[in-house]
Amino acid sequence: MGRKKIKIQRIPDERNRQVTFNKRKNGLIKKAMELALLCDSTVSLVIVNNSPNAKEKYFQYISSGLPSPMESIPDLGPEISQKFTDHDYDKIFNKKEKGDFNDDYIGGDTASHSEEEDHKSPSSTPELLGYNHHNHHHHHHQYNNNSNNNNNNHNNNHNNYNNSNNINGHNNHYNHNNLKLNSNNNNNNSQFNSSQHINKPILSIKPSQTQENHNHYNNYSSHLSNNNNNNNSSNNNNNSNNNNNNNNNNNTNNNNTNNNNNNNNNNNNNNNNNNNNNNNNNMSPIGSPPSKCQQVPAFDSTQATQALLSLHNASKLFCSSPEDTSPMTSPRTPPFSSTNTNTLQTSPNSQQKSKSLPPLIFNENNNQNNNNQNNNQNNNNNNSNNTNTNNNNQNNSSRSILLPPISLYNSNSNSNSSSTLTSPTSSSSNLNDDLFLKKRKLELIH
């Protein structure tokens, strides 16, 4: 939509000729004023309109310090329609205040032109060319500054996207696309709209893989907290069951039996706490999301006791010295055989279980069920122990069973435990077997 070129000849239409005269007359007077002001020159301009229908016929411009040429002509003096001087430039051609212009071009009646401006743009017009030209010039510089800033942001976003693998890289990638759109908007003279578009938040970003990992990690941490709460609730239930057992024992037994029951209950509490701690330790660490490689199988105390009984009975048959009776240190441990020695003889609930030893591979969902079964079994063991101690205390009321702590590498304790296991018929040996197995489980857990 450029301006159509016209042929330089007389315009036949009077209306078009008058419009063209007004436009070009104003432009010619403006250029004459600029020449006088910028270059400190003396300019005199006289324009006469020969159109018969023109209301204004004569136009003149004189620079300062120059007499008016048309006033010296007496016949034409009164007919001068418009007279322009240097002071009329800002009133006619400039619609903005003087404070908006550069100070290099304003110096009173005559302005001094800087040499730097001539060196930078010798063919360009200064900012005193008018309001429209000044606005166009101002937007041109603003567009250049915006394009430079967009190029810098473009390069920075490229660097950030190449150097990072997290969500910030994806955000910068989308910012890069938005900056491309903004550069196109700047070419269409919409700088302000594009700047507002840059400040808008980006809502169309797809979640990256790291966001999914982060959400999965949050879900996993909540899963850990739920497991811990469930374990704490199971401990509270165990404590309440043990307290009920203690109350029943206080009603039916003597002081010696109460002391023994308290010791048994403390051992059961320690065993339950260690099982719960073991379940928490089987979880993957908090600092990393769970994976299939990090899931550790849980520890089942019921199957551990069956394994200990089988290994201990086999070690009595095949080991030559009491030092080799420990199942952790014996190199001559025989293969497992599904016999009656694999089951616990102390509790009736354990005899109902399977005689063969299943593989020690579990899921995290079965840990709490196993703990509940172990707790029920421990409570049944407490009841059976209470009946045994009642019978013993009726025969020997002054006798209390106190065993030293058993370690895996103590031959004396192993020999004592083996001697107690050789007599399964008596009730005191059954109680010693139960205490030995519980302490051995605690040592294996630690």
From Swiss-Prot:
Composition bias type Low complexity, residue spans? 143-195, 216-282, 365-432
Which compartments is it annotated to reside in?
A: Nucleus
Q: What is its main location?
A: nucleus
Keywords per UniProt: DNA-binding, Nucleus, Transcription, Transcription regulation
Gene Ontology molecular function, alphabetical: DNA-binding transcription factor activity, RNA polymerase II-specific; protein dimerization activity; RNA polymerase II cis-regulatory region sequence-specific DNA binding
In its UniProt record, which GO terms are filed under biological process? positive regulation of transcription by RNA polymerase II
The biased composition feature labelled Polar residues covers 322-355
> Domain of life here?
Eukaryota
Which residues does UniProt assign to the signal peptide? Answer: none
**Protein name from the UniProt record:** Serum factor response D
The residues that cross the membrane are: none
Cite the PROSITE patterns for this sequence: MADS_BOX_2 (PS50066)
Any one GO CC term of the record: nucleus
List the InterPro entries hit by this protein, alphabetically: TF_MADSbox, TF_MADSbox_sf
Which residues does the UniProt record annotate as the domain MADS-box?
Answer: 1-61
One of its Pfam families is SRF-TF
Ranges for region Disordered: 95-195, 210-296, 319-432
- Organism this protein belongs to: Dictyostelium discoideum (Social amoeba)
* Biased composition range(s): Basic and acidic residues: 112-121
Comp. bias regions, Basic residues: 133-142
